[in-house]
Amino acid sequence: MTIVDAKFLQSAQSVNDSPAPNVAEVAFLGRSNVGKSSILNSLTSRNGLAKSSSTPGKTQLINYFEIKFKTKNEETPYLFARFVDLPGFGYAKVAKSLKAEWNKNLTGYLQLRPNLQIFVHLIDSRHPELEIDKNVDEFLKEIKRGDQIIVNAFTKIDKLNSSELSKLKRDYPDGIFLSNLKKRGIIDLQDKITGYLFGN
């Protein structure tokens, strides 16, 4: 199964002004500068689809993208889902500050969106043990429903040497390992998403 089309749908400030929850959604979240926009663009083969903005306020919006998948089934040749680009979170060091870092609306989206199926937590492979990422992982595990999964995807692996990458893979055997620069792991992430959403 491959992505054949991707387009920006809308931005929203909260779950209340989000699109109708009638299509499965995949949420991408991670620290600021983790490479989230680049990964989204590589996944969809659409340069500039997701844009990292330096404009204050822009980064606080939830951005929705409609994704069209081509199947191998003649009866159902296309399937649809949404990728959701969430605001990057900052560098808070205390667990209690997590919900303050993310505004109330973002937390509401993560907890209340009924069609949200996959959390893709993007983590900088050079700093896999940061407290903020551990806090996010714990938070997601707390709110995760039985029909949802968390995917830990490690970005910028081209910055690691071979022994560092081997250790990372040992430490996180279920992780996805990505290099946007060298386009490594992109298909692995796509397969993980489509396998869970559509069973293939």
Swiss-Prot record:
SUPFAM superfamilies referenced in this protein's UniProt entry, alphabetically: P-loop containing nucleoside triphosphate hydrolases (SSF52540)
Keywords: Cell cycle, Cell division, GTP-binding, Magnesium, Metal-binding, Nucleotide-binding, Septation
Ranges where the EngB-type G domain occurs: 22-199
GO MF term list: GTP binding; metal ion binding
Binding residue positions for Mg(2+): 37, 59
The keyword ATP-binding is annotated on this UniProt entry: no
A GO biological-process term: division septum assembly
One of the Pfam families matching this protein, by short name: MMR_HSR1
Cofactors demanded by this protein: Mg(2+)
InterPro entries reported for this sequence: G_ENGB_dom, GTP-bd, GTP-bd_ribosome_bio_YsxC, P-loop_NTPase
Superkingdom, natural source: Bacteria
UniProt-annotated binding residues for GTP: 30-37, 57-61, 85-88, 155-158, 177-180
One GO location term (cellular component): cytosol
UniProt record similarity statement: Belongs to the TRAFAC class TrmE-Era-EngA-EngB-Septin-like GTPase superfamily. EngB GTPase family.
Listed HAMAP family: GTPase_EngB
Purpose: Necessary for normal cell division and for the maintenance of normal septation.
NCBIfam families to which the protein is assigned, alphabetical: GTPase_YsxC
Protein name, per record: Probable GTP-binding protein EngB
Organism classification: Bacteria, Pseudomonadati, Campylobacterota, Epsilonproteobacteria, Campylobacterales
